[in-house]
UniProtKB/Swiss-Prot annotation:
Domain F-box: 7-60
Organism: Arabidopsis thaliana
CDD domains per record: F-box_AtFBL13-like
Keyword S-adenosyl-L-methionine attributed: no
Domain of life: Eukaryota
Keyword NAD attributed: no
LRR repeat residues: 114-136, 138-167, 169-194, 216-241, 292-323, 324-349
Matching PANTHER family: RNI-LIKE SUPERFAMILY PROTEIN
Annotated protein name in UniProt: F-box/LRR-repeat protein At4g14096
Keywords, in A-Z order: Leucine-rich repeat, Repeat
Xref: InterPro entries: F-box-like_dom_sf, F-box_AtFBL13-like, F-box_dom, FBD, FBL60-like, LRR_dom_sf, LRR_FXL15/At3g58940/PEG3-like
Amino acid sequence: MDLSGCRDIISSLPEAISCHILSFLPTKEAASTSVLSKKWRYLFAFVPNLDLDESVYLNPENETEVSSSFMDFVDRVLALQGNSPLHKFSLKIGDGVEPDRIIPWINNVLERGVSDLDLHVYMETEFVFPSEMFLSKTLVRLKLMLYPLLEFEDVYLPKLKTLYIDSCYFEKYGIGLTKLLSGCPILEDLVLDDIPWCTWDFASVSVPTLKRLTFSTQVRDEFPKSVSIDTPNLVYLKFTDTVAGKYPKVNFDSLVEAHIDLRLLQGHQGYGENDMVGNATDFIMRICNVKTLYLSSNTLQVLTYSCDAIPIFNNLTHLTIESNPEVGWQSLPGLLKNSPNLETLIFQGLIHKATDKCGDVCLCKPREEIRSCLASSPVKVIKILKFGEISDDMEKQREQIKYFLETMPNLEKMILYYNTTSVEDVTEVSSRLQRLVSKLASSTCIVQLISDNLSLSSTVSTNGLLCF
């Protein structure tokens, strides 16, 4: 085929568009275009985003040579770009990269006014980020990962809105975190992942401008001594931690949505109240303004054993409960009674530990011994996720659903998300639901059975089976 008349459409594009296209390519591929012509070499010099990942170059047979090649490549890329403005710089490196090469790279992009800095630095030897990084006047987003030491004399990041710290260490522990946050006057989004503050004397997050906070640690055999969180404008919270010894100050005045996974100290799950370490009361009392709340099964356990009282959740309209075969529902009755405006109740599974202290929301005790708090519940919608996931307890799950339907007069809709690959199972459950129509506490309630695995849906109402 004669290609002599074909046009080079890419090369004929305006330089701004070509440069924009290059910014979406991995840096290794984008850099390779610089050998095509002088024009492409010029264009690459103005690519605003650099994504440099050592793993792209790794070869297990000769890691030393590959690491050296990667370091030389980064040097060439930065030299080629000169002093051109840079928007985003992402660097992912391992132990094979020399620390003395990393510092100049970071300083180079800081001097060029980078606004989005993403550093994944895994080193067996101690590595400290350059102090200039904590005095940047251009950084808007900063992400630091994988074991570096955060050491700084001064911090002032006047434009920083998003800060993500994962598996890093603070030289002065709680004092270091406090100093870092105090130097971020307009911070809005903070993620602290795998930060070992259980070993600190205290931990404090005090940021008046913060809107979103995510904290997570997987340490379960130690508990933090003291945790304070003063965030009056926070609207979203995702919090995973072991119950602290104390919570001197907690301010969630503006909180709208919270995902809480508080855990008892490992080994204390079956202890009595007098044996508990820590007390979650001051923390739980401060989340009472939320509209949407997710509670893990661990948190249900904390509410039972490590919380003096359950607050009134006047604003709560959506509540999600995670169930666990090893954890009871003792705290659930009080939680539902103290949620006077709850509209949607979601269960991630129904199987829980049988106990005579579950109150009146389940069938752990004989039916004749209980008066259901559900009879006065304002809940309009119940969603059951993972229904049928534990097939050995199907009868217990069906009885629990029946109990909900027969005792909740305000219920308008129940949706069951059935985890099954059997059409026969769906048909059987649908038939059982149909037989319950005359016993529903709510005359307007609709029950919908959905199986995504089978792309099937069955709906039952007081008028009978609507569709299948």
